[in-house]
């Protein structure tokens, strides 16, 4: 058995040299494209979170959504899921990609944000602003990307008071929670397991709270110990009743 941390990049490398994986691989990846025989993906499925938050956004009355992302595999995966979900529900949408060149040039970045918002200099003196082009914005990029973009969106009249901001569980990070321009963002997340005793013990030993991957690593180590006592690995891993772990049921 091969146990994580085996993330998406490593899985891709394994697939390039091995056609048929014969031993069980318990991976930390959450990339559904990498599903395979004998490979189990145990990371949080970000695509599911995107579908949940879109459903919520539609219920709040969003009719036109801007999907904003960057030119990365992570962002493209979420954009693909969001676009498919919105088209199936008949919601008007625009996909807006920020290239690395634009993100690294403050002048180009400002210009693109102004173009998206329809901002004009004369709006600064108006008490009542024109209706925004979008009633919702879905962020699909990294934390760094979102932190670079959000203050500019806010400055150019696409702030969270005028437009509904949506995101996934990335928004639980302290970086995004503490960013003033992102206050009022709605985001989806899987339920955190109720494991106070484990967390308290972890803090006593290590002086900090365990991350999701720390909890998952603990689960996998314990699982491997149990698995070593089984004759048929595959049958045990895929048993009907599943497995109850600290990080959730699998």
Stretch-by-stretch model annotation:
Residues 1-250:
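Extracytosolic ligand-binding ectodomains
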């Amino acid at each position: 058995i091969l146990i994580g941390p085996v993330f998406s990049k490593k899985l891709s490398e394994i697939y390039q040299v091995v056609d048929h994986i014969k031993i069980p691989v318990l991976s930390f990846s959450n990339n559904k494209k990498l599903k395979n025989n004998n490979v189990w993906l145990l990371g949080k499925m970000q695509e599911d979170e995107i579908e949940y938050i879109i459903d919520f956004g539609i219920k709040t009355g969003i009719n036109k959504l801007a999907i904003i992302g960057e030119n990365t595999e992570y962002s493209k995966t979420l954009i693909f899921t969001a676009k498919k979900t919105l088209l199936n529900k008949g919601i008007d949408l625009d996909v807006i990609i920020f290239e690395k060149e634009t993100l690294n040039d403050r002048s180009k970045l400002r210009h693109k944000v102004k173009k998206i918002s329809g901002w004009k200099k004369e709006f600064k003196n108006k008490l009542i602003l024109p209706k925004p082009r979008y009633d919702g914005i879905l962020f699909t990029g990294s934390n760094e990307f979102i932190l670079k973009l959000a203050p500019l969106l806010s400055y150019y009249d696409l702030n969270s008071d005028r437009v509904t901001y949506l995101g996934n569980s990335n928004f639980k990070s302290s970086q995004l929670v503490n960013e003033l321009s992102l206050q009022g963002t709605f985001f989806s997340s899987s339920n955190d397991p109720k494991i106070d005793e484990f967390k308290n013990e972890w803090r006593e030993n290590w002086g900090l709270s365990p991350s999701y991957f720390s909890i998952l690593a603990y689960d996998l180590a314990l699982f491997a110990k149990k698995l070593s006592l089984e004759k048929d690995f595959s049958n045990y891993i895929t048993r009907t009743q599943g497995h109850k772990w600290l990080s959730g049921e699998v």
